[in-house]
């Protein structure tokens, strides 16, 4: 069984690998520090990513150091210290992506008013790109998925397959945002 993008690995294998990778990352980063998962669901793999997140939610729901909100919005907004953090899958038009800083500020005005630095995480294009756009650090994350037909046609086949995680440190060793 393969998912709609015809991944080389079976959907079930992909889900198990993604869950194991996420649990390993949480095991590495969560001892002694709170970690919050930001649920971001894709377009063609929305059911798969939602299922993976629901598993992680159930696994960590009684663990004090791991925060697992049940957001299912297209874009997720958080504040950490003076950081305004946004995450989205990124399956929008290039024009909308260029407007993402403006969209962030409009949709989360309270967070925008209380922060000095902004960062946007998104994926969708399966390759890693980091750039500053309108004063906002934009991190386009690589994908944990095997190449699909689109990737093969566009020569994205050598991109690393990773489950991206990011740590923003605050003032102390137990003060981090993953």
Per-segment meaning from a language model:
Residues 1-70:
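Core catalytic region of metal-dependent phosphoesterases/phosphodiesterases
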Residues 48-50, 77-81:
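Short, solvent-exposed polar/charged micro-motifs at secondary-structure junctions
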Residues 56-58, 62-74, 81-178:
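Conserved beta-sheet core of the metallophosphoesterase superfamily
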